[in-house]
């Protein structure tokens, strides 16, 4: 598989504050081979994001990557990030035939802890930091979005091989505005989402450990 993690960071050129933020997140992390990709402009932010991701995946196919990391410019590493553990989990999820490996989510419907630090998820939101594997490239490229669709919800419709690291290694930094999801513009809203999902996964992890110890 890849030696360094091929990383594509999405940034609207006018959002210089986000560009500076995301460069600071990655500049001292040598395990990532990152490039900043200019986001496709569209009057509907979610459509522009999807089109940008399509362009990235087409590029990844041309470069014959086994997987890539797609990252939005509001991604922020948490203190839980560990280079060797992240790389190990990328390989572990690949052995499970994962389509996506998420660094952190703002919502999920169902979850099952398969191993310490790795959950299978059903229905999620949060594409600020995710590994997408080669097996899913063409499937992603065949996605079509309507004006009222959202890319993460659309992915949920076509994949049941979505996994997430826990504890989260990625959350979304609040900038006071969103180019994709207007409901996330309220102060503290995004932080609350991630706090809630973290607590839910912590409970599921605790219960799994508890019942295993009863055996």
Task: Describe each PLM feature range.
Residues 1-71, 75-215:
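An acidic/histidine-cluster motif and surrounding catalytic segment
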């Amino acid at each position: 598989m890849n030696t360094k993690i091929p990383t594509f960071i999405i940034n609207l050129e006018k959002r210089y504050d986000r560009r500076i933020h995301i460069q600071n997140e990655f500049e001292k992390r040598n395990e990532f081979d990152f490039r900043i990709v200019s986001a496709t402009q569209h009057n509907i932010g979610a459509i522009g994001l999807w089109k940008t991701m399509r362009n990235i995946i087409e590029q990844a196919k041309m470069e014959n990557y086994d997987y890539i990391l797609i990252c939005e410019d509001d991604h922020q590493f948490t203190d839980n990030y560990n280079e060797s553990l992240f790389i190990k989990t990328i390989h572990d999820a690949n052995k499970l035939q994962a389509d996506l490996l998420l660094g952190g989510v703002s919502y999920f419907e169902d979850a099952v802890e398969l191993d310490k630090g790795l959950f299978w998820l059903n229905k999620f939101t949060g594409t600020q930091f995710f590994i997408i594997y080669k097996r899913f490239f063409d499937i992603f490229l065949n996605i079509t979005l309507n004006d009222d669709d959202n890319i993460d919800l659309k992915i949920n419709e076509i994949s049941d091989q979505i996994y997430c690291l826990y504890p989260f290694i990625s959350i979304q930094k609040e900038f006071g505005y969103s180019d994709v999801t207007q409901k996330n513009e309220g102060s503290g809203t995004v932080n609350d989402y991630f706090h809630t999902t973290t607590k839910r996964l912590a409970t599921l992890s605790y219960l799994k450990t508890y019942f295993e110890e009863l055996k």
